Amino acid sequence: MERTLIAPGVHLSCDPASKFNRCRISIHFAFPAQRKTATAHALLPLVMERGYADCPDMTRLTKKLAKLYGADLTVDARPMGCNHNLCVSVTGIKNAFALEGEALTAEYTKIALGAAFHPYFVDGCFDPQAVSIEKQMLKKGLEDEINDKRIYCLHQANREFFGDSPAGVRQEGYLEEVDGLTPAMLTAAYQQMLRTANIELLVLGCDAAQTAAIRDALLAELACIDRAPLLLVENMAMPAIAPVHKTENYDMVQAKLCMLFTLGQPMQPQQLAAVRLAMALYGGSVTSRLFLNVRERDHLCYYCSSSFQSFTGSMAVNSGVEHADAARAEQAILKELADLCTGPITDEEFEDCRRGLLSGMNGVEDSLGGIESWYYIEVLRAGANSAAPIQSPEQARNALRAVTKDEVRDILRRLTLSVSYLLTKEDAAHAAE
């Protein structure tokens, strides 16, 4: 993957991806998340995906994509630590496979740039009807999260964990703000994104001439905008604190327990391989300690797994437990972490986890979407404002092969519990309270 700076705050990353019969053009907008515009930016991709100036409704857009041999347009948003990311992506077959020699890549470029820079406006703002429809969809999604107690517990724990820090901005939006959003507010948020976002153009499966044409078309669009890209927020970590225990009571069959840990300092890119193996050993695989011991041996959890967020240097352990077993489950989870830090790690479990990770990483390059996700996250993880080298999947696999038990223990020893959040129908709180 080649990455070059083509304008202030704008990079081009490209790969010919010759083994695929499809190509992909993606435009990523990344900018610091802000509390006051979080809900508008959560709504933005839903409205943008409905169409653009040349295809102002979903019917015409669907017909256009169908004529291009079933091309696909997606506009989505995803949180990246303290930064927000909106991506416009078009995927379709390469020119070489067009039955009548159509210039498909040029059409994909028009669609991607149209969706990104020429949305369908009515009187200078997003279409009020489209905004109204998508507000209901966003509202329903946020309401559904409350009913999914696993997600709700994680969000409540995150709110307690991050507090007022930039990573605490709820980038999925705030339910109480959805009804108040207007087309004018959404348009203002969109225009702010165009002015201030760092832009990553990823072109996969195109030759050099096609890539250059896509680059030039993007630069022509940007020339019409008074750009002032903001520096992205670098990776962070919450400071270590005395553990905070919170309990909410709900009438539910299964209690939910979410425990959040912090590294205490930002994760460095060179630590990533050890972090991956540490998570697989602790709770990220079917051979992990949490799965084999807390779930299978002790029968304390219906599920119990760990995950790590590199942008915020935090680990989450999520579990579903019997109400009466919540305190025991928490202590068992902490014990497994302590045992990995100070006790033996067998060669068998260590290599099982390593092989499992390597097997999963072997599939990264099996799809254009996988390649794009890998490299874009690597860009952000390394620091989008820096010239740090970007790690390829093969380099990451080699780094994983070199990780030692001591390196894994060093990562795990840095993790300290900050928040333990319990949803239960019983009034009994954690044993630690």
Q: Where do the PLM segments sit?
A:
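M16 family metallopeptidases and their MPP-like homologs
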Residues: 13-15, 21-41, 58-114, 150-173, ...
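Short, Gly/Pro- and small/polar-rich lid/capping loops
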Residues: 1-9
